Amino acid sequence: RSWFLKYNVTISIDDLHPEQGWGCEGDESVGYLEELNKEFGCKFNLFIPSNYHGKYPLSEHKDWVDFWKNKDWVELSAHGHYHDCRNGGPGECEFAELDYNGAIERISDSMSEWSKCDYLPEGFRMPGWLCNQESGRAIGEKYSYVAIHSHLNDSINFGTKTIKGEVGIHKTDSINVWNNTFMF
């Protein structure tokens, strides 16, 4: 526990959305995050789809966005718009099936939802980690940084800052430390 006193810890969590059990006030998981922040000072980067599976548009859940954005130990980041494929692409890898123009349109739809909640995320992570060079270029043009998979996205030139990660800490050969902050 003493190493927590020397470093900041930031934990990234994907797929939060305004559905009970997925990050709503009063959910057991939210209590765990609050306790980790209180006890250890952990900070969280929440990657949030702006209209999860077409069922939870953020603009209809502004109070949910406000709940999270009012916590100074949380950063809200974009995690696609639908978090699923609309054109027969692979699973939930929304940006794997989009060309440049399709990605720009999808990002615009996402930013519109966020804007209606008086918030514009600076960071982005692709649902399912995957994209192609064209959609990756569009993502890089619209966000300050992209959280990428350390192996799946190596060949993509995003044209913006990238932060590498894995599916889980058990898959990581080493823990990344950046500016005195552990990155999980």
Where are these regions (language model features)?
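Active-site beta->alpha N-cap acidic-glycine motif
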Residues: 1-71, 120
